[in-house]
C-alpha cells in the first residue's frame, strides 16, 4: 500500500491536480503492480520561496514548475521496476498535465508491512493476516 505526497506549485488548477494524481497512480499500477483501488495521495501546494533547489543538479535543467513526488511503500521492488516507475511518472505527467520531464522529481521511501495502519488504530499486517486466516 503506497502512500504518495505530491508537492506542486501554488495555483495549480483542480483539473491539473486531478491529471497529476491520475498520472502518478497509473504509473504505480503499471510499473510496480499496485491494485487499482490502492489510491492514497496527498497533494500540497508550495509558494515561490517555499521550495529551494538547485536548478541544474546532475545536469537536469529545472524550472519554477517542479513537481515533487514522494512515494512511501513497502520494500521489495527491483531496481528495474523503480526505473520503470520513474520513467512512467515523468511521461504521464508530461502527457496528462504538460509538466516538463525535467521538472518531475521523484523519490521513494521504503518500509515494512508492520509500519502501516490504515484505520481503526490497527496494524495493517494484523488485518491482512486475519483475512487470510478466515479465507
Predicted regions and their residues:
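A domain-level signal for the structural core that forms small-molecule/cofactor-binding pockets
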Residues: 1-135
Amino acid at each position: 500500500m503506497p502512500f504518495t505526497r505530491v508537492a506542486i506549485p501554488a495555483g495549480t488548477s483542480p483539473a491539473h491536480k486531478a491529471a497529476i494524481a491520475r498520472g502518478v497512480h497509473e504509473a504505480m499500477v503499471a510499473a510496480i503492480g499496485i491494485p487499482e483501488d490502492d489510491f492514497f495521495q496527498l497533494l500540497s501546494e508550495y509558494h515561490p520561496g517555499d521550495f529551494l533547489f538547485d536548478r541544474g543538479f546532475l545536469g537536469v535543467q529545472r524550472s519554477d514548475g517542479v513537481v515533487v513526488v514522494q512515494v512511501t511503500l513497502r520494500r521489495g521492488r527491483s531496481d528495474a521496476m523503480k526505473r520503470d516507475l520513474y520513467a512512467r511518472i515523468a511521461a504521464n505527467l508530461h502527457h496528462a498535465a504538460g509538466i516538463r520531464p525535467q521538472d518531475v522529481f521523484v523519490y521513494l521511501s521504503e518500509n515494512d508491512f508492520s509500519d502501516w495502519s490504515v484505520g481503526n488504530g490497527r496494524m495493517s499486517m494484523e488485518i491482512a493476516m486475519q483475512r487470510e486466516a478466515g479465507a
